[in-house]
C-alpha cells in the first residue's frame, strides 16, 4: 500500500466535555423530537440556579489562593508552600468589603507551619487519612516539584469552578479519572487526596452561612475526590474478524466527553410510547428520516408485528432494507459501489474498512442484488456482536469507537447528513489509489490541477459533481514539466543551456536590439520598440491593454523607447502596475496568485511545494512587490532572458500540451441534426405580410414616443441663480400654467407682485406655481368654463405634468374640488408627495411622459397634443372599468 495515499483529513473536533444544556438538547436532537416536559424542567432548574452557580464560582475564584494555601499546608512542612505557586496561573484575590477581608484573614491564618502543626491537623480534619501518607518536606522536595504540585492543586480548583458553571460534573470525570496512577509515578497520590479533602473542608467553611452554596460545593468536590480515587478506565477495543482489518483501541475519555449515541432496544416490557420511539429510531437509521412524520408513510403491518414481539428488531430492519422505499431512495439512483457504501452506513453504522471487504460484499450485491446484500450484512458476526436481535443499528462515529486511519476522510463524510447527495463512490476510489502509481499532477491538493491554466487550485469547492480525492504528494515531490523544444535542453538535467534558444522547435523569442529577432518568422516590423512593448503586454497581462490602461503605462513605455530602462526593468514595472495586481493578485488567494505570476514572468509553472513556499514566505513577510523582485532578480531569469529578452513560455504540463492539441479521443463526434425545411405554424403566423418602410419601422420602434421626450428642457433655480436664469424660469412657469407666454402688456398689474417677489428670491418656484394657479386669470381661463372633470385634467396637466392616473384619483380630486373649491384643489396638488419627489421646491413643472400605469401615457399624449380652447371634451373617460381603478 502506498504511504502517500490517504482519504483526506477533514477537520474533526471531538467534544471535550458536556454541559447540562448541551446534553439535554443533543439527546432530543438525536431522536428528532421536541424537548419533553422532564427535559424542559431540567433546563429550567439549571437556568434558575445559574445565578447561584456564578456566585459560588466567583467566591471560589476570589479565595483560590487561600484554598490552595490551606491544602498545601496540609501536606507540606518546613517552609511556605504557597510561595511556590506561580502567579500567572493562580487565581486573583479580589477583596470586597471589610467583612469579606476579615473572613479571608480568618481563613488564611498563618501559613508558616511546622511538622507538629501539620501532623495535628490531620486528626482534626475528620475522615480517615489515606494509607501511605507522609507529610512532605519542602526543602527535600525541591523547587521544581513544589511548583508542579502547587500548579496541580490550582488546576483542580479551576476545573471545579468550570464544572459548577457548566452544571455537569462531566468535565471533572473526563479530566481527573486516571490521574492517580500518573501522580503515583511522580510523588504520592495519598498526599493529593489529603490536599483535596482539606480544600473541600476550607471551601465548605467559606459557605458556612449559605446552605445551597455549601451543598453545591460539596457535590462537586465529592466528584473530584471520588474520580481521583477511582482507577483509570480501560481502553475500548475494536476486535476484527479478518486479518485485513485493523484492530483499534480508543480511550474511554473520548466517549465519556461527548454525548453518546442513544441505544434503542426493543423489549416486551416497554410501554406503547417507548415502542413507538424504537420504531421511529429504525426509520431514522435506515431511511435517514422519520418517514411517518415527514412523508406520512408507515409500514403498519411490520410495525404491529415488531411491537407485539412476533418479529425482532433485526428482522424489522431486514424488511425495511428490502422494501421498495429503500430501493428507490438508496439503491436505484446510485451505482453499485455507492449503494454498497450507503448500505454499510445504514446497517452497520460505518463504512467499508478494506478493499477485500469491499470486494466481498460487492460480489454479493452484483450476484444477488439489494436483498442479498442486506441479508449478508445482517447475518454477519459483526452485526450480531454490536446489535444482536433487539438493538437498532447506530452510527459508530468518532467518539463512539476508534476510527481507522486509512479511510478516515470517507468514513467521516459517509456519516454526514449529506452523504446520499454524493453520487460518486469514495471508498473504492480510495482503495484503488493505494495500489496505483502516482499520477502526474500538481503537488498541492487532491489530484486536481494538471492543467497549465488552473495553477494553485489547492482548495477546490465541491459544489457540483464532487470528486474528492486524496492529496498523494508530499512536500518533497517535484512536478513533471515538459520543455518547449528539444528535451536535451531541459534545465534540470543541463542547467547551462538555459539561455540557449530552442530554434524552430521552440517559441518565438523577441529581443530588443537594433533589429528585431523573431524566430521562425519573416514579418517586417516598423519599430522594434513598439513590438517589444506590445509583446510584453501580451506576455505579462495575457491580453492587449485597453486605451485607458495604455495611458497609465505610457510613461513606462516612453522610458523603454528612450533607452532609460531595459526590457527586464520594463517587465518589472508592468508586473508592479495596478493593472497586473487587479488581474493576478487581488482577486486570487496567495498560492494561486504566485502560480500565475511565476508562470507569466518566468515562463514556467512552479516545480513543487518547496519553490512556492519560498515565494509564499516572501509575500507574507515582505509584500507583493518583493515577490516580483525575487522572481525577476532570480538567477534563472537573468540566465534565461537577460536584460533585453521578453519572457516566453519555456515549460508546461503534459495535460496542458494535450489540451492544446486535437486528438481523435477528445474530438466530439456528434454530427449536426438535419434541419427540416418545414417551419412551425407560429413562425408563419408571425411573418410580416406587407412591406414596411424605414420610417414605418422607426415609428414602431419608438412605440408612439416622439423626440420631444429627449428634447425636453428642465428649468431649475437656486440661491446663486442669476437674474437671467430667474426670468427664464418665470417665463417657463407662465407657459406651463397658462399654456402661453404672458408679457407685461397682457398681464397688467395682477402678477407684478408675484413676479417681483420671485425675481428678488423672496419666494421659490413651488410657491410661484401655487400663486399662479390661484390667480384670477387661471380661474377665468381653466376653471369657470369647464366641468370639474376637465378642471381636474387641466390641473394635473399644469401642476403635475401628466394626465390623471385612474378613476380613483379623479374621484378623490373631484370631492375636494366640489366641496372646497379651486384653492384647496391647487394646494392639494402642489403640496402632494408626488410633486415634492418629482419637482421639489426649485424646479418648474414639465411634461413627464409617464409610462405607468399603461393607460396614462396615451391620455397624457392626447391631453398635450389637443388644443385646449378648440376642444373642451374630456380625455380621461378612456379609462376602462377595471378592479383597482375604481
UniProtKB/Swiss-Prot annotation:
Pfam families: PBS_linker_poly (PF00427), Phycobilisome (PF00502)
Post-translational modification: Contains one covalently linked bilin chromophore. This protein autochromophorylates (Potential).
GO biological process: photosynthesis
Entry keywords, A to Z: Antenna complex, Bile pigment, Chloroplast, Chromophore, Electron transport, Lyase, Membrane, Photosynthesis, Phycobilisome, Plastid, Repeat, Thylakoid, Transport
Thylakoid recorded as keyword: yes
Main location: plastid
Location of the protein in the cell: Plastid, Chloroplast thylakoid membrane
InterPro entries per record: Globin-like_sf, PBS_linker_dom, PBS_linker_sf, Phycobilisome_asu/bsu, Phycobilisome_asu/bsu_sf
Binding site for (2R,3E)-phycocyanobilin: 187
Documented EC number(s): 4.-.-.-
Membrane topology qualifier: Peripheral membrane protein
Domain of life, per lineage: Eukaryota
One GO CC annotation: phycobilisome
Domain PBS-linker per the UniProt entry, residue ranges: 244-424, 496-678, 695-876
GO molecular function terms listed in the Swiss-Prot or TrEMBL record: lyase activity
Family per record: Belongs to the phycobilisome linker protein family.
Function (record text): This protein is postulated to act both as terminal energy acceptor and as a linker polypeptide that stabilizes the phycobilisome architecture. May have intrinsic bilin lyase activity.
Protein name: Phycobiliprotein ApcE
Organism of origin: Porphyra purpurea (Red seaweed)
